[in-house]
Swiss-Prot record:
Subunit composition and interactions: Monomer. Forms homomultimers of about 100-150 subunits at optimal growth temperatures. Conformation changes to monomers at high temperatures or high ionic concentrations.
Keyword Iron carried by entry: no
Function description: Associates with aggregated proteins, together with IbpB, to stabilize and protect them from irreversible denaturation and extensive proteolysis during heat shock and oxidative stress. Aggregated proteins bound to the IbpAB complex are more efficiently refolded and reactivated by the ATP-dependent chaperone systems ClpB and DnaK/DnaJ/GrpE. Its activity is ATP-independent.
Record-annotated sHSP domain positions: 28-137
Protein name: Small heat shock protein IbpA
Gene name in the database record: ibpA
UniProt keyword Cytoplasm, yes or no: yes
Domain of life from the UniProt record: Bacteria
Source organism: Citrobacter koseri (strain ATCC BAA-895 / CDC 4225-83 / SGSC4696)
Pfam families found in the cross-reference section: HSP20
Keywords carried by this UniProt record: Chaperone, Cytoplasm, Stress response
GO CC entries: cytoplasm
Compartments it resides in: Cytoplasm
GO biological process, one term: protein stabilization
């Protein structure tokens, strides 16, 4: 008997939460967990991604959404400062984090607050997909 860990699916696929009970496959994480992030279900049709980007300025972050893929990139401006660390526990490396979005999930905005990048998402259900009442004659 095999046990499947579906937690990687919850972390990188936004808007598929209704389908997770049916899934049996696991998705691999290729970017090693940096930077750390949370995916929050705000309400039935709203999600929020919070990414820890301490040390990055707003100008060093780039967010793009194309088709069903959300890409967040962070690239530090080249600095020629030499530093001597006694201990370095804060990562200063560049990153690229990708999130596969479900159909009908749209990015509504982003803001940077106290080292956390918040990206707000919304599920927009087209009128054609909404249930409609059929009257009986």
């Amino acid at each position: 008997m095999r046990n499947f860990d579906l937690s990687p699916l919850y972390r990188s696929a936004i808007g598929f939460d209704r389908l997770f009970n049916l899934l049996e496959n696991n998705q691999s994480q290729s970017n090693g967990g940096y930077p750390p992030y949370n995916v929050e279900l705000v309400d039935e049709n709203h999600y929020r991604i919070a990414i820890a980007v301490a040390g990055f300025a707003e100008s060093e972050l780039e967010i793009t959404a194309q088709d069903n893929l959300l890409v967040v990139k962070g690239a530090h401006a080249d600095e020629q400062k030499e530093r001597t660390y006694l201990y370095q526990g804060i990562a200063e490396r560049n990153f690229e984090r990708k999130f596969q979005l479900a159909e009908n999930i749209h990015v509504r905005g982003a803001n940077l607050v106290n080292g956390l990048l918040y990206i707000d998402l919304e599920r927009v259900i087209p009128e054609a997909n909404k249930p409609r009442r059929i009257e009986i004659n």
